[in-house]
């Protein structure tokens, strides 16, 4: 007794779509909970217009009715990769967790996914008695076993709205990431991945279509490059090398190494820019000398008296890198985190059939070669140096209503490098900010520490920065990674400085506002290559 065509016109769907929906609804493979005697979801999220028309004509469609429900809304247009989104459960979701039934919503990305169980709450239960025709005859045992629904828990994020908005502005027209962390807690203050999208596109009936459009975009706006991008860290990695060489006794703070246009030994040349030579650690960091760190690695890997074999030396080196947060997932409370890559001896034994030495792998000492890291790992390195030897696993959730954070995020994680050696690295990063490769930071009235990186790439080099401020009692650690941005001083340092100023001062100076506007307008031509 159903006028199917009238129903289709009312809901603004075709007859073919009606048939497809009914087939899906009755298919027990796609809808395991189907029963002709229980209510089934035919269509969700009607538009205001369709709802109004349907309400007027509902009496013509026996068996169909409307049920109100809450849907997710996002107030602002920023932080899409952090917030994530929700969507209707898939058959696999239902199969994996019997909490869900068709028509339920589940977190798909970001915080929505990581904290799904805290956000979803608990469903209410009402047990009803029905006759053989499915008609309700009353409550079972007068509702004795019924249960009221329990709302999900409120989450408080650590994201600073103004900082996040500024970071997204600065990266417009560029591919890359900005991550800022509070060193004393591990709380993530901003996590910017560019290109991005408006999280409000992932709400409502158009979510599926909008998701398809974003998925097809060759610049991959759905990719959270802050935790999924795996890049060479470039010269920001030199800080880890200095700490390792000092802690292992390969060098002292005053040990100098020569650099005449680079590292030159046994026919191998690793170039470097002009600066005084020879240099010890602190000025080698401030000038970003390649030669110093190449020599340091060469002497560590070749020290058979201390390590016995190059393999044992290499694995000791790797242990230091892992202790500093590289080569494994840090454990951030967001889905999809990549681990980056830190090679061990077996990698080179396989590649070179056991015939290799420090010269073979010299490029890893300057953050090139096989070494890769995520922007989050680079920012975490900044936080570790700021803390002089320990870090908290970075996280975006600051507080869970009536609950405690996982101890993963509240326990300190110490590195293998000795605490006293961090002061030399801090001195080098401060010197870089006052007169070295990060000297653009000298304009600020807070004591910033920084390290540039210019990561070699098949095309134009990537621009990288890692730093923190102030030098003592630091409040913020920052990593900036701009694909094909050129020198670290071209994009990394100025963008990192603006992020520091915004957070420490609460607003940008008039001069900095003009500089931020300038960088917002800058575009990098990436051509038509898919990334």
Where in this protein do the model-derived segments appear?
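Beta-lactam-recognizing serine transpeptidase/beta-lactamase-like catalytic domain environment
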Residues: 131-136, 140-146, 184-236, 240-488, ...
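Periplasmic/cell-envelope proteins involved in peptidoglycan metabolism and beta-lactam response
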Residues: 1-208, 230, 313-323, 365, ...
């Amino acid at each position: 007794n159903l006028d199917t065509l009238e129903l289709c016109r009312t809901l603004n769907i075709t007859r073919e779509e009606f048939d497809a929906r009914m087939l899906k609804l009755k298919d027990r493979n796609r809808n395991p909970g189907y029963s002709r005697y229980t209510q089934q979801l035919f269509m969700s999220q009607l538009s205001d217009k369709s709802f109004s028309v349907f309400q007027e004509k509902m009496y013509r469609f026996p068996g169909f009715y409307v049920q109100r429900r809450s849907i997710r809304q996002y107030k602002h247009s920023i932080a899409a990769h952090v917030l994530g989104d929700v969507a209707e459960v898939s058959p696999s979701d239902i199969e994996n967790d019997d909490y869900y039934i068709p028509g339920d919503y589940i977190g798909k990305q970001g915080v929505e996914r990581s904290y799904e169980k805290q956000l979803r709450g608990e469903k209410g239960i009402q047990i009803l008695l029905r006759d053989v025709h499915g008609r309700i005859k009353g409550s079972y045992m007068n509702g004795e076993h019924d249960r009221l629904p329990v709302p999900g828990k409120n989450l408080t994020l650590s994201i600073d709205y103004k900082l996040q908005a500024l970071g997204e502005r600065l990266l417009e027209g560029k591919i890359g990431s900005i991550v800022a962390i509070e060193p004393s807690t591990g709380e993530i203050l901003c996590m910017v991945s560019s290109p991005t999208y408006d999280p409000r596109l992932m709400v409502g009936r158009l979510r599926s279509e909008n998701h398809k459009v974003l998925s097809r975009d060759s610049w991959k706006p759905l990719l959270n490059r802050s935790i999924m991008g795996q890049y060479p860290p470039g010269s920001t990695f030199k800080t880890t090398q200095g700490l390792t060489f000092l802690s292992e006794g390969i060098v002292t703070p005053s040990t100098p190494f020569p650099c005449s246009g680079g590292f030159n030994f046994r026919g191998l040349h690793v170039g470097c820019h002009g600066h005084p030579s020879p240099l010890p650690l602190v000025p080698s960091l401030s000038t970003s000398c390649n030669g110093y760190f190449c020599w340091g690695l060469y002497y560590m890997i070749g020290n058979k008296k201390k390590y016995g074999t190059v393999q044992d030396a290499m694995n000791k080196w790797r242990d230091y890198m892992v202790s500093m947060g590289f080569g494994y997932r840090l454990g951030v409370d967001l889905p999809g985190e990549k681990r980056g890559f830190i090679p061990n001896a077996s990698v080179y034994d396989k590649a070179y059939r056991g015939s290799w030495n420090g010269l073979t792998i010299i490029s890893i000492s300057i953050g090139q070669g096989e070494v890769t890291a995520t922007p989050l790992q680079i920012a975490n390195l900044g936080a570790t140096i700021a803390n002089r030897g320990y870090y908290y696993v970075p996280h975006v959730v600051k507080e869970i209503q009536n609950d405690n954070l996982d101890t993963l995020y509240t326990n300190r994680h110490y590195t293998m490098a000795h605490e006293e050696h961090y002061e030399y690295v801090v001195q080098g990063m401060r010197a870089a900010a006052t007169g070295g490769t990060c000297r653009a930071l000298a304009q600020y009235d807070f004591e910033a520490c920084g390290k540039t990186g210019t990561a070699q790439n098949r095309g134009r080099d990537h621009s990288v920065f890692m730093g923190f401020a102030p030098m003592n009692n630091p409040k913020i650690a920052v990593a900036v990674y701009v694909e094909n941005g050129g020198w670290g001083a071209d994009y990394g340092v100025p963008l990192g400085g603006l992020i520091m100023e915004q957070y420490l001062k609460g607003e940008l100076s008039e001069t900095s506002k003009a500089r931020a506007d300038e960088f917002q307008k800058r575009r990098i031509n990436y051509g038509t290559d898919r990334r």
